[in-house]
């Protein structure tokens, strides 16, 4: 069995796991400890390419250079980071997100919002990431509540919004909200705090803290004006 394509389908966790499996398939001798060193992946695509098909509207792992693997026994989330693991093909079909229950819709939506906000305020933002981040923020602001209430047109726009946010943060990177969410996400509540819920808890506090910096405050003000606050 030597597949030349690997397909990861589902929410962020299954697709992220498939990204790691892809590396082990191509390089069986590689250890997980090798992969957790940032931007230290071996060259992939020697055996297979990767297609990601998301069925939730939050992580945007289908367009990013990141994967998060959780060790529940140790209570640790390991972020894997390397442009090698950016999928070759992403199939972003909103129909696949229509069966998300309300809580999952809320949590993944706040993950997408946090991706976009952190990308826009990132010190690595640029003219290419800003439009993606701002438009994603506007879409989530307008559509998340309706998506939660079962509006499938809003659900479809949320699926696209999270992908835009992913393209933004995969290039501009993220901030301390995600740092804390990853560190605490696997450490409490019997081993897990839902990632989007952790982001939602930390984002207001981090905005207040970051806004002490004039440049960050100006970027947050841009966001507020753009969405009509």
Map each language-model feature to its residues:
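Buried hydrophobic packing segments
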Residues: 17-22, 116-117, 137-143, 162-166, ...
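Glycine/threonine-rich beta-strand-loop-alpha-helix active-site module
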Residues: 3-95
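Glycine-rich phosphate/pyrophosphate-binding beta-alpha loops
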Residues: 58, 163-199
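Short helix-capping/linker segments at secondary-structure and domain boundaries
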Residues: 120-125, 172-174, 207-218
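Gly/Pro-rich interdomain helix-loop hinge
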Residues: 186-229
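Carboxylate- and glycine-rich phosphate/diphosphate-binding segment that chelates Mg2+/Mn2+
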Residues: 66-172
